[in-house]
Amino acid sequence: MKTLILSCNTGGGHNTAGRALLEELNRRDLPAEMLDALSFGRKHTSRIVSQSYISVASVTPKLFGGIYHLGDFISSSHRKSPVYLANAHYAETLHRYIVENGFDTVLCPHLFPAEELTWARKKLGGTYKFYMVATDYTCIPFTEETEPDAFFIPHADLIPEYEEKGVPRDKLLVTGIPVSRRFPEHMEKAAARQALNLSRSAHICLMMTGSMGFGDILPLPEKLCAAEADVQVIVLTGSNAEMRKRLAERYGSSGRVIALPFTDRVADYMAACDVMLSKPGGLTSTEAAALNVPLIHTDPIPGCETRNAAFFQEHGMSLRATGTEEIAQTAASLLYNAPLQQAMIQAQAKTINAYAARDAIDLALERCSSPGV
């Protein structure tokens, strides 16, 4: 099996899922490549689309939510959307690349390449198989107008939602959301703290702002530290250099508040913390659950993140809080509530498949060797 993974730079989660799948393929020494699906468009297509997404989602989240819900409203299996038509413009170039390079399997942890390949196979044929890999705990708008060989979805409880949108039941395969093995196969807390040079005795609260540093979190560390004397707050600010600078200016070098840039050691910081605060992105939430971290979801970007937060809360895998005061109070309560932490960890272990990447590749391999499937 030779695999092409197609993602997009509209948020870090899609690429993170893609890299988890690539990691699993590399473990098995299977030929694989990961590309930006929008790179097959015009020269600046990827940059323009990605920057527009980030700008709308971070600067005007209510507008983003309105656009999402409008998409949900007009989404239908009976007609093609403007999203489908826009992606069709560069589908032929992508199709040619797949055929010329001998890929027999394509994995799409993003809607856009699934739209492209739906058009390409209808108009141009092709013997390769492609799969859409969901990265949120909901059926996102326009999923039903794509026609992959199968949909790899996060949980069996989402099957009715997909069916209601018009996705055929026999195409729904429950795998979970792919995350790196670094999360389920993490260091113990004491070892992680030693490796990161963190306090062994402090109650550590990890604040995740997402790959793009969403959220006005400046006052929150102060509230968290005020709750108890032994609380230490670590803020992973993603690519938001301005946020990191403002945190450093406000909290100095006391050591109680540590602001860090983008890091490839997220799993280690999660393993080291006692409680994690995060916006409810599908990937970050799944990584936390795969690592069994007590989790508090903060203000979501309206749309699929709202659904993610609801799914986690309904399954006992997280708490939810909004606003600085409520978030600080909820975090302080959870930090010192061992029974609630344990109940949350047990719910995460019961609900989340930490080895979804492995299972997705197993299914793709099985179907690659069975032409009729």
Describe the function of each predicted region.
Residues K189-Q194, L198-C273:
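Donor-nucleotide binding loops and adjacent catalytic segments primarily
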Residues G12, A17, H69-G166, K171-V174:
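Active-site and donor-binding regions of nucleotide-sugar-utilizing enzymes
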Residues D268-R307:
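A donor-sugar binding/catalytic signature common to diverse glycosyltransferases
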Residues D149-I204, M208-S211:
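A nucleotide-sugar donor-handling region in carbohydrate enzymes
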Residues A354-V373:
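C-terminal alpha-helical cap of glycosyltransferases
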Residues A20-E100:
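Conserved N-terminal ligand/cofactor-binding loop architecture of enzyme catalytic domains
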Residues L340-A354:
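A short, well-ordered alpha-helix in the C-terminal region of glycosyltransferases
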Residues Q313-G316, G323-P339:
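C-terminal "capping" alpha-helix adjacent to the active site of nucleotide-linked donor transferases
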